[in-house]
Curated annotation (Swiss-Prot):
The lineage of its organism: Bacteria, Pseudomonadati, Pseudomonadota, Alphaproteobacteria, Magnetococcales. Binds 2 heme groups via the magnetochrome (MCR) motifs. Heme 2 binds at residues 246, 252, 255-256. The gene is mamP. Belongs to the magnetosome MamP family. A motif (MCR (magnetochrome) 1) lies at residues 195-218. Residues 1-7 are cytoplasmic. A motif (MCR 2) lies at residues 238-258. It comes from Magnetococcus massalia (strain MO-1). Subject to proteolytic cleavage which requires both MamE and MamO. Exists in a homodimer-homotetramer equilibrium. The chain crosses the membrane at residues 8-21. Its main location: membrane. This is Multi-heme protein MamP.
Amino acid sequence: MKLKGTTIVALGMLVVAIMVLASMIDLPGSDMSATPAPPDTPRGAPIVGGQGQAMGLPVAMQRRRGEQRAPVPALSDANGGFVAPNVQFSEAHWQGMEALPLSIELKRKLKLPLDLEGLLIDETSLNAAVSGLLAGDVLVAINGRKVKTLKKMQKETRRVQMDRRASLTVYRKGRLLTLTLSEEKNLGLAQVETAPMILPGDIMPHPYRGPCTQCHAIGTTGHITPDPDGIVLPPGPIRAGAKMPHRDRGPCAACHAIIQ
């Protein structure tokens, strides 16, 4: 039996319609059904499928057995600077004295006994100077309690902060001396500091003493740049024939504007 052309065209259109209809029906077990993307999932929480079943953890959170998370290397100050969590103290100030850790390097430079333990007194003023303390002394003890570190010094000054006087044991030129530190109201607590903040990549101005971050914070917000003490203002104008206030440094007009 021969089919007419119109019949063939009609059969073709019917087949196409059946295929389109089949593609729109989600048959059970069909591999054609699409799996919706999981919603945003909190880090570490299981991914849940459309029926509420757990589908596993995010790949980024899966760790191998024995694998540990890397420790946080540092803290940040309020302005984003790098601050090591266990940064060391570099100096302490108390009643006009400035105390430094007595390192082996300093003992050798100052020709002090290598077994001497205490804190180097770098500067004295105010009540510390009145007590007889001198720059170059080594503070050994406060009220008989040894102070081998700046942290220990702060602890011992905390004990006597409400007192009006305390005894200081110091080493000076091979002898141990006892001095009395006094204040009319109270002695207060020693204030400690770390080494100053340095810029990333700064050139080391001293012998190697371990990682820079043991003592320094890294950043740009910890000090004024340039240092105000290092700023030299231009010389002001002077009158012709004025008396020279300093030694001869060459023609006055080289530095000063001359007012007639």
